[in-house]
Amino acid sequence: MASIAVCPGSFDPVTYGHLDIIKRGAKVFDQVYVAVLNNSSKKPLFTVEERIELLREVTRTLPNVHVEAFHGLLVDYARSKKANAILRGLRAVSDFEYEMQITSMNRVLDENIETFFMMTNSQYAFLSSSIVKEVAKYNGDISELVPPVVEQALKRKFASTAAD
């Protein structure tokens, strides 16, 4: 049986921290579905389509990584992909409590789908999409935080916002 994982997130925008988890997951699992969600509790900077495009660009050298949008319950999406795992990145202990609640709920919904936590590389432990957006908004240097294509997309996005 193939090992198939779903790596969910809003990826608004994708950072080197996200990419670290995706690349490492691609070494462990036969197939990884990066599931881009539209979180209604967050106001995204990039549309789902833009986030998918950026993710596809930065993962194009990973043949076993697929990027798609999803809505609804994560376990339903995982089942639709015949996934037996959910892959989640952890930056710090503070992430764990929230992730544990989500994992426990997912186990109630489908006990056959396991959740795997991967600690992000220590150089990205502080990194979040929110921090990246805040630094980019004020023209700070984000070149060590996101891939070049994402850096350019952020510059365009904030240039157009400033022009409005």
From Swiss-Prot:
EC number(s) given by UniProt: 2.7.7.3
Pathway: Cofactor biosynthesis; coenzyme A biosynthesis; CoA from (R)-pantothenate: step 4/5
Any GO MF annotation of the entry: pantetheine-phosphate adenylyltransferase activity
Record keywords: ATP-binding, Coenzyme A biosynthesis, Cytoplasm, Magnesium, Nucleotide-binding, Nucleotidyltransferase, Transferase
Enzyme class: transferase
Presence of keyword Calcium: no
Gene Ontology cellular component terms for the protein in this record: cytoplasm
Site feature: Transition state stabilizer: H18
GO BP annotations listed: coenzyme A biosynthetic process
Top-rank taxon, per record: Bacteria
Subcellular location: Cytoplasm
Cofactor: Mg(2+)
Binding residues annotated for ATP, in chain numbering: S10, F11, H18, G89, L90, R91, E99, Y124, A125, F126, L127, S128, S129, S130
Residues that coordinate or bind substrate: S10, K42, L74, R88
Catalysed reactions listed for this entry: (R)-4'-phosphopantetheine + ATP + H(+) = 3'-dephospho-CoA + diphosphate
Protein role: Reversibly transfers an adenylyl group from ATP to 4'-phosphopantetheine, yielding dephospho-CoA (dPCoA) and pyrophosphate.
HAMAP family (alphabetical): PPAT_bact
Protein family (similarity comment): Belongs to the bacterial CoaD family.
Record text on subunit structure and interactions: Homohexamer.
Name used for this protein in its record: Phosphopantetheine adenylyltransferase
Record gene name: coaD
